[in-house]
Each structure stands twice: as C-alpha cells, then as structure tokens.
UniProtKB/Swiss-Prot annotation:
Family: Belongs to the eukaryotic PMM family.
Binding residues for alpha-D-mannose 1-phosphate: R28, R133, R144, R151, S189, D191
Function, in words: Involved in the synthesis of the GDP-mannose and dolichol-phosphate-mannose required for a number of critical mannosyl transfer reactions.
Classification via InterPro entries: HAD-like_sf, HAD-SF_hydro_IIB, HAD_sf, PMM, PMM_cap
Protein name (Swiss-Prot/TrEMBL): Phosphomannomutase
Active-site annotation: D19, D21
Chief place where the protein resides: cytoplasm
Record field: catalytic activity: alpha-D-mannose 1-phosphate = D-mannose 6-phosphate
Enzyme Commission code: 5.4.2.8
Superkingdom: Eukaryota
GO cellular component, one term: cytosol
C-alpha cells in the first residue's frame, strides 16, 4: 500500500508514538487485524512510530504481517527505547549498554541477579532469566521461555507478592553507584539500563523533525512502569490505555478515524 508523504497528511506536524506490549498488542502476542487497519488509517493523517524495550526482532514478530518489514509500517521505529532507531526505513546511530557500563560491573550485576533468582520461591521457573540487549538487560524471575499460560500465572502471583518490585528495590540499593534505572514492564520482567536511557531516549531522534505535537500511548504509565518517563515528559501529550482495544477506541475518538 502506498504511503502518503508526511507533508501531505492532514496533520503533518503531529507525531503519535506507541508502546508495543499492552498498547498495540497483547503482551508478546501478535497485532490484530483491527489494530493494523486503525494504524493504517491513522498514518494517513499523522506521522506514527513505536517505541518498545525489546529488540527489533521481537517487535518484528509482533507487529509484522505477511512478512512485511515492520520498519516500513511506521514512520519511526524505536527498538530498545530508541537505542536502535529507524526513520523512514533508514537506521540511525545506536548505543551500547555493555560499552557504557563495562564488563567488570556488568558481570557483578548479572551474577548477583542470578543468585537472587536462584533463591526465589515462585510457582515455576523456566529459562532465559537474563536477556542481554544492545541498550539494556531484561531480567525475568520466571524466565522469558515461559509459555503464555505460565506468564499469566506469574503475573497474577507477582501482583500479590511483588516479586519484581521487591527485586528492583534490592538492586537499586545494591548497585546505587552504577547510574542505572530499573523499570518494570510487561507481565514477567523488568529492564535495567543507564539513567536517561528510558523511552524518553527516543525523543532526541524526533526533536528536530519539526513536530508541534507528540502524542504517546502506553499502558505502564504509573511511576515505576516503563512508560512513565515518556508519559510525563513535557515534550509529549501522554495517554494511558489499558489494552489494545482501548488504544483503538482512544485513537478513533481523538483523531476521528
């Protein structure tokens, strides 16, 4: 489908950014046909982009249809909070977590986390407790290999026992001199990245693009959630949603699409 050039859209000075999990798709699941249609209609009137903590391959799995490259479906694609960034299909400069932190500190952090998780008493443990990404590490007490049913079970358990929140508090104190941010997101994990490398990082890529208005839609907009910083940032108009259906309803109401 041909894409209308931004300057020919109804609101060429407006950018709408989206979180992925819980906003455009159910957590770690694929985008719905209704959401895709809504985004296509929205792209006719404004510029659109996504910003997620996962690497681009995971966002490709969730947002791509029929093998289409996800970076072609959005004007801006920000993986790992914008540390891997694309503008109109062209990659921008990237950053590296490991180069910033250093191997020695990184290993101390990882070793502590693995020992901590080993001692946790939770219903199930699977695999991939720590996932290394370009701009952060993702830590999951249950393991990212958990299936959908196990993820749902852990999410319910975590709401009552505060497994992730407690671990984050411990890490903040233990590694307070590392200059790190700990941010809970999704169902089963939390992200660890340098202070300032939250989702607001992506805004540096669009600040000089001439937008008058930048909307952001996210579901983890509470303090400590991984959408909070960009949600409250003065450069954006934040919208808190509960699920993809809520996102669609809000978009139709705001942009009359």
């Amino acid at each position: 489908m041909a894409v209308i050039p931004i300057e020919e859209r109804k609101f060429p000075k407006t950018l709408v950014l989206f979180d992925v999990d819980g906003t455009l798709t159910p957590a770690r699941l694929s985008v719905s046909p209704e959401m895709l249609e809504t985004l296509q209609n929205l792209r006719k009137v404004v510029a659109i982009g996504f910003v997620g903590g996962s690497d681009l391959s995971k966002q490709q799995e969730q947002l791509s249809v029929n093998g289409e490259n996800v970076i072609d479906s959005f004007d801006y694609a920000f993986a790992e909070n914008g540390l891997t960034a694309y503008r109109y299909g062209q990659q921008l400069a990237s950053q590296s977590f490991i180069a910033w932190l250093g191997e020695e500190k990184y290993q101390k952090l990882v070793n502590f986390c693995l020992h901590y998780i080993a001692d946790l008493d939770i219903p199930v443990k699977r695999g991939t407790f720590i996932e290394f990404r370009n701009g952060m590490i993702n830590i999951s007490p249950v393991g990212r290999n958990a299936n959908t049913e196990e993820r749902n079970e852990f999410e319910r358990f975590d709401k009552g026992r505060k497994i992730r929140a407690t671990m984050v508090d411990v890490l903040r104190e233990k590694f307070k001199d590392y200059g790190l941010t700990f941010s809970i997101g999704g169902q089963i994990s939390f992200d660890v990245f340098p202070a300032g490398w939250d989702k607001t990082y992506c805004l540096q890529h669009v600040e000089k693009e001439g937008f008058d208005t930048i909307h952001f839609f996210g579901d983890k907009t509470y303090k400590g959630g991984n959408d909070y910083e960009i949600f409250v940032d003065p450069r954006t108009i934040g919208h808190s949603v509960t699920n993809p259906d809520d996102t669609i309803a809000e978009l139709k109401k705001i942009f009359n699409i």
